[in-house]
């Protein structure tokens, strides 16, 4: 049984995840024998999930085996009682906790590569699992031989080796191992695929499960193309404020993307900047219908902290205003520089004193201002509509009134002609 040893070097500290099953024990045997000169140091990690009674016996067996072969061994016992009590998917919970511990130990050991015993049959099983449960469209279809984790790499040297070859190797060299009885229980989906579905396909001479590997290769190439296209789109069209985590993108440019690419773009943005994961395809599709509607403004709640705002031609992700304090009314009695919500007001000393005190407030129903250069008045609300000002900006924008309570400025959109040089309003942070 030949390992693919391209994933580590002769001066590497390699770590093997050993369950005591036939796959990992055969991998360990090969590393101790035919591949003993391919690394600098070898360490074993073993996880006791604490679910089966045989777990204690397996851990003791591995301790004795590693002591006999002078291998450092670290064992972790997981507490999965919470998942058992709530009837959650214990396999998924165990995997998450297992890899959290692997991350921790690889850092503690300052090791280079973690080896796992995933083999060809595991690959085929995973491909089928992801196709059948709908997780194939936004993930790679199976395992990569080499993948990156936090500060180290995971390598799968048995990925081209079949289960049949592993069994033959074990029988030839009488390698000790433990059989996990739960692997025979078809109530677990992966077991059902492994024990029932794949053998049924193999019995049909016109079908070959191995063709799934060609599908994986094609699928993963398309996946990489989508990832690249999403990054290109983000670089070209997305504006992001790191401090406030305010994100803005052209609504039209986003709507022009195919749905598959839209999902990847949002996956990238929401996971990277907002730590939001696993939003369903169905939810995304509902959003896309709203994004492409003719409605000029609306909002979608992401979480209790984040919201998507659609404002005319922009798609915006921003913090909710809940809990934020905004000025509603402010009195200015003399020239100077002032901050009102997210705006900076520069009141020059040349502004006629008869206009003081100034009142700065947010909009009110029925607000109007005198048009510059012609007779008549215009509603502030109509100005907002004409300038396509988003609702939440309207709620914060400063409206300046003189001593007689006449509107002489509306944010950075309007200043009365006679005082234009002496009241300058800009968004706070703008140059």
UniProtKB/Swiss-Prot annotation:
UniProt cross-references to CDD domains, sorted A to Z: TilS_N
The EC number(s) attached to this protein equal 6.3.4.19
**What keywords is this UniProt entry annotated with?**
ATP-binding, Cytoplasm, Ligase, Nucleotide-binding, tRNA processing
Q: Which domain of life is it from?
A: Bacteria
Q: What is its main location?
A: cytoplasm
Q: A GO molecular function for this record?
A: tRNA(Ile)-lysidine synthase activity
Q: Give the enzyme's main class according to its UniProt record, as a single word.
A: ligase
Task: Give its localization.
Answer: Cytoplasm
Q: What is the catalytic activity of this protein? A: cytidine(34) in tRNA(Ile2) + L-lysine + ATP = lysidine(34) in tRNA(Ile2) + AMP + diphosphate + H(+)
Write out the GO cellular component annotations: cytoplasm
- Output the InterPro entries linked to this UniProt entry: Lysidine-tRNA-synth_C (IPR012796), Rossmann-like_a/b/a_fold (IPR014729), TilS/TtcA_N (IPR011063), tRNA_Ile_lys_synt (IPR012094), tRNA_Ile_lys_synt_N (IPR012795)
Q: Which HAMAP family does its entry note?
A: tRNA_Ile_lys_synt
Entry note about domains = The N-terminal region contains the highly conserved SGGXDS motif, predicted to be a P-loop motif involved in ATP binding.
Q: What role does this protein play?
A: Ligates lysine onto the cytidine present at position 34 of the AUA codon-specific tRNA(Ile) that contains the anticodon CAU, in an ATP-dependent manner. Cytidine is converted to lysidine, thus changing the amino acid specificity of the tRNA from methionine to isoleucine.
Q: In which family does this protein belong, per the annotation?
A: Belongs to the tRNA(Ile)-lysidine synthase family.
- The identity of this protein, by name, is tRNA(Ile)-lysidine synthase
Q: Which organism is it from?
A: Staphylococcus aureus (strain COL)
Gene coding for it: tilS
